[in-house]
Amino acid sequence: MAHPHLLAERISRLSSSLEKGLYERSHAIRLCLLAALSGESVFLLGPPGIAKSLIARRLKFAFQNARAFEYLMTRFSTPEEVFGPLSIQALKDEGRYERLTSGYLPEAEIVFLDEIWKAGPAILNTLLTAINERQFRNGALVEKIPMRLLVAASNELPEADSSLEALYDRMLIRLWLDKVQDKANFRSMLTSQQDENDNPVPASLQITDEEYERWQKEIGEITLPDHVFELIFMLRQQLDKLPDAPYVSDRRWKKAIRLLQASAFFSGRSAVAPVDLILLKDCLWYDAQSLNLIQQQIDVLMTGHAWQQQGMLTRLGAIVQRHLQLQQQQSDKTALTVIRLGGIFSRRQQYQLPVNVTASTLTLLLQKPLKLHDMEVVHISFERSALEQWLSKGGEIRGKLNGIGFAQKLNLEVDSAQHLVVRDVSLQGSTLALPGSSAEGLPSEIKQQLEELESDWRKQHALFSEQQKCLFIPGDWLGRIEASLQDVGAQIRQAQQC
């Protein structure tokens, strides 16, 4: 076997060659290529004239010796037009019911069937056997067929509860295509002079029969790690709970796993990774409603669980809660405690500063930062005389935020423990303490837990960075996963700075 990374590079270059001259069809080409490399079937849904047949024709050039067959179904199509005419000679001379299959579906590696749902029962039944068993019954003989890729297309979905559902279930990959949307791509398409039937693939990139057969065995050796299986099972359980979720057969799940193995194999990996599960968005939907639902559920899985994002946030929440508990425990020990005076008959309780507080200007630290007057405040400077007057007579109190600028009006109070508490506009409070009486930085317990959490985050981010080099996954999905991981990292770093 070639070096895994060399194989991944070759498949990437092969796909780029197949995509030449096709606009906004990269994802479709790549998934059709993946289907061909793993022996699966594809259903293309979309209006006429959007290059569905051209995609199938292009895939023939991925292989050195591939033969292609394409056919437009009508309600009057006969098995002879798809599987080959009867041999009059064999019937006349030997009484054998035998088809001449040369040039027809039974001898083609790449098959494209347009308007597939218009096919009659005789064609559909034979097609089911061809897809399931890769066999074709030709008279008394059962012949093995070489089909590597079946691309079926239509501008509509099969009717529910119809005889077509069995065939539809065999279409593992389902792609919903539309017209070219981007202005520049539309212009390039209009002015392109490329002959669509030319072979765009260099011979050095084309796949030989021997390589294809060897790869089929090696794909099956790709492992499914426990944590990836747990993600798949989580998705399955979540879909089962949703009332509008599509029915996904065990057969479809089984075939989808092989597709994930192929994605890992042709990405140079020896095991399925969480990023491969994004492919399920093109395997599990049934109609427009379920397409959106499946994408939403897989998005939640990828941005919340696949790289332990939600688990790390849960751990962070527990650490922050523990830090708050420790801060609360420390507040009584470190906070500035004022002295309650007598004055039972006075309208207002009076206080005074401790006798050991003698400086003319007092700098008091906030146990936790608050946003006051549009500023993140960590300490406040008071004139001692002003603070003593406020403690004695009440009224307005002002202080310099972070010791700078003009003194600002503050919402200050004395709590039941005789501590000074400053509050912001949302009435969130922070106890004030003298310098040196508040613990420096984070408690060692919290610091260690945050360091361990950050280490785990770095490992998960490194795993994603390594796994995201996957040809078959759209970049916008990778971007959302990266953003989810960066958000977790930012919250961890913010907690470390408190």
Swiss-Prot record:
ATPase activity is stimulated by ViaA. Its EC number is 3.6.1.-. GO terms for molecular function: ATP binding; ATP hydrolysis activity. It catalyses: ATP + H2O = ADP + phosphate + H(+). GO terms for cellular component: cytoplasm. Keywords: ATP-binding, Chaperone, Cytoplasm, Hydrolase, Nucleotide-binding. Its main location: cytoplasm. Homohexamer. Interacts with ViaA. It holds the Pfam family LARA_dom. It is an enzyme of class 3 (hydrolase). Belongs to the RavA family. InterPro entries: AAA+_ATPase (IPR003593), ATPase_RavA (IPR023671), ATPase_RavA_C (IPR022547), MoxR (IPR045427), P-loop_NTPase (IPR027417), RavA-like_AAA_lid (IPR041538), RavA_ATPases (IPR050513), RavA_LARA_dom (IPR046898). Component of the RavA-ViaA chaperone complex, which may act on the membrane to optimize the function of some of the respiratory chains. RavA functions as an ATPase. The lineage of its organism: Bacteria, Pseudomonadati, Pseudomonadota, Gammaproteobacteria, Enterobacterales. It is found in: Cytoplasm. The gene is ravA. It comes from the Bacteria. This is Regulatory ATPase RavA. ADP binds at residues 23, 49-54, 196.
